[in-house]
Amino acid sequence: PRKTTAPKPTAPAGPATATVTLPTANEQFDYQIGSAYTLPKNVRVVSRDRTAKPAAGLYNICYVNAFQTQPDALDWWEKNQPDLLLRDGSGAPVQDEDWGEVLLDTSTAGKRERLAQIVGGWIDGCAKSGFQAVEPDNLDSYERSDGLLTKQHNAAFARLLAQRSHAAGLAIGQKNTTALLPERKTIGFDFAVAEECGQYEECEEYAAAYENRVYVIEYTDTGYGRACAGWGGKLSVVQRDLDVSAPGGSYRYRAC
């Protein structure tokens, strides 16, 4: 990526009380959701956790785990909102075992409204901290729900988050989940954050849907090579280590 034109304000989809600024396509990107650190040279767009500070002078995307619990937050949910955790027939929380996270229950309108109050508070916090956009993670949690959640449950919740984001003056990114690309406008998504679209040959779908406003993270050499060869001139493509760690140890970052 070499473009340096400033992001242009655009009218958001759905209700809004503030101007939303979209990220510029094909600017150099870094994915710092594991730990914030000094930015590599030429980076203009960065994604950081909602608890981190945004980078001065850059376009900052705020990472929010909106559809699952953070591993260290499960006790809070169990104590304060136990019925918002998705549970199986025996009453046990349904887990994303790869990451040690419990799925949030988006299956009813009432629960979605309550979840939107909680996650919406985080989104408002992103705006107050100075971020320009939000990426709600685990939009695809329904795929790990053993049939207890559907694509439409999560789309309906994402719509509430898009409305809250736009009202706070934040753009909102679709995180993965090509199955929901046809509903992107109904939901209100503005751009995409796509993990491993090179690895799984999905970059073209995101690029077409979002006019190249796609921020690609690859974790393998193969995926990075494919994404760069096919899309490095149009999309923002980086390779990170799976733990998205700070420099040192397993840290890896490169961009094309």
Predicted regions located by residue number:
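Glycan-processing catalytic domains of CAZymes
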Residues: 9-256
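Secretory targeting and sorting signals
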Residues: 1-4, 10
